[in-house]
A protein has these predicted regions:
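Active-site/ligand-binding-proximal alpha/beta "capping" segment
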Residues: 95-145
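Short, surface-exposed amphipathic charged segments that create phosphate/polyanion-binding patches used
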Residues: 1-2, 89-94, 108, 150
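Extended, non-globular alpha-helical segments
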Residues: 1-17
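RNA substrate-binding interface of SAM-dependent RNA methyltransferases
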Residues: 14-99
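Structured adenosyl-cofactor binding patch, chiefly the S-adenosyl-L-methionine
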Residues: 8, 43-45, 59-73, 125-164
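Short basic, glycine-rich beta-strand/loop surfaces that mediate nucleic-acid
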Residues: 5-9, 68, 111-117
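Conserved beta-strand segments that form the floor/walls of ligand-binding pockets within enzyme
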Residues: 7-9, 24-25, 51, 114, ...
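Gly/Ser/Thr-rich helix-start
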Residues: 6, 37, 71, 96, ...
Length: 164
């Protein structure tokens, strides 16, 4: 059941992206519930800024706000051209990709850019070309019928390896 009435009132503030040694970049995230959950998960792991492609859902969408459970007021979401961002930062780029190496076999640094694509389309081909290391979360065994993990779940698993 959807809530009735106002969910939250936000004063939309424009922030300046801080220079960090670690960035989460989201490519084409269209599901508001996923973006809200990602914002909440990022806050849990101490990440206070996220970069989204310009074709991602608006972070002030009511479903994003609801799913973020208040984290949107503490995690800043920026919209940018991802290719330009990657070129500007000149950092090692990881990409969550079903065809990548097992994340538990990859030496993952606590720095760089992590790119996550939408569940339905993955990371855009032009961005895939910029990725230095594709990483996947393997199934526990090949008999598992589920095709993939939910995007926020994948992000949470990877962040737990990097940030804890």
């Amino acid at each position: 059941k959807s809530p009735n009435g106002d969910l939250a009132v936000f004063n939309i503030t424009y922030y300046t992206l801080k220079n960090e040694n670690f960035y989460i970049v989201l490519d084409g995230i269209n599901d508001p519930g996923n973006l809200g959950t990602i914002i909440r998960t990022c806050e849990w792991f101490g990440i206070n800024q996220i970069i989204c492609s310009k074709n991602s859902v608006d972070c002030y969408n009511s479903k994003v706000i609801q799913a973020s459970m208040g984290s949107l007021s503490r995690v800043h979401v920026f919209y940018d051209e991802i290719l330009s961002f990657i070129d500007l930062k000149k950092m090692y780029v990881y990409g969550a990709d079903i065809n990548g190496e097992r994340y538990d076999d990859v030496k993952i640094k606590n720095s760089g850019i992590w790119v996550f694509g939408s569940e339905s389309h993955g990371i855009s081909k032009n961005i895939i070309a910029k990725i230095d290391k594709k990483v996947k979360i393997p199934k526990s065994n090949d008999s598992i019928k589920t095709e993939s993990l939910n995007l926020p779940v994948s992000l949470g698993i990877i962040l737990s390896k990097i940030r804890l």
